[in-house]
Amino acid sequence: MNLRLPTRRETLAILAVAALPRPAHAVGLRVATVDWSVLETLLALGALPVAAPELLQFREVAVEPAVPPSVTDLGLRGTVNFELLLLSRPELIYSSSFYVSSEPRLTRIAPVERFSIYAPGRPPYEPAAAMMRSIGARLGRSDEAERYIAEAEAEFAALRERLTPHAQRPVIPINLGDARHFRVFGADSMFGEVLKRLGLANAWSDDTSYSAMAPVGLEALARVPDAWIALIPPVPPGALEVLAGSTFWNAVPSVRAGRLLQLASINPYGGLPAARRFARLLAEALLAKGPAHG
């Protein structure tokens, strides 16, 4: 019997398919998630979930890791489409402390494992790393998890060294509520954790609530006159235009001195991928400004 050897094109196609990230169920489990930090983590490990929520918005807000089109969009995070979730036939559902109220319905579909990264007064980085290790162990990707965590620490260390000329000036990471108010990310936010790893001080020392405190008036920025302002999207429509013509805004010391950094979108409730994205975007913005502003 004559056996036909594969052509070069067929061989390349086979190799290309083999190089694609494996779905999570390739190691025995079809996994779904209702939480973005878990989604980031699964994608970073190359373990594709069968379903996850708000994928269009995830691609705009979290941006990375990229979500393949094969992942089913479950709709809103707080009120996922349970019919679509059921049709996705998950064997395991990952959730978080944000979605405890949904668990009675989720457990009717598949077993639920819950993570808690964000809690008042508790820095989230180590819980995020622990979550990555737990997911990696569950899905047979412990090596990938350890490699990713090591790469993150190495990236922070490298950026910290590059940012040494900026280390004497603090950073205040904020998100605009409107043209008169902002939310600030404190020490118990992921952004606050990253600042420490980059050797940068958080200019905001008051208490916050694990992501960002309730909106405060822009006049509070005058309390941190020496800081860099790291502006994190989303920005309300028209807010920047209003601020550009605001005498008060332009009199804020940091703004007047040109120390306003407008960053690209980042998930404020993210896991390690969001932490790395924030570190990279902030470092790029600071380095682009140069030490003259430092």
Predicted feature descriptions by range:
Residues 30, 36-84, 88:
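A short, structured surface patch at a secondary-structure boundary
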Residues 35, 39, 43, 82, ...:
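Extracytoplasmic/secreted envelope proteins and their assembly/folding machinery
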Residues 39-44, 58-61, 179-183, 239, ...:
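Short, solvent-exposed loop/turn elements at domain surfaces
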Residues 5, 27-28, 211-215:
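A glycine-rich, coil/turn loop motif that links secondary-structure elements
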Residues 30, 111-177, 204, 268, ...:
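Extracytoplasmic substrate-binding proteins
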Residues 2-5, 10-26:
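N-terminal export signals
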Residues 29-30, 34, 228-294:
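Structured C-terminal subdomain patch of bacterial secreted/periplasmic proteins
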Residues 63-119, 162-262:
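Binding-cleft/active-site segments that stabilize strongly anionic ligands or cofactors
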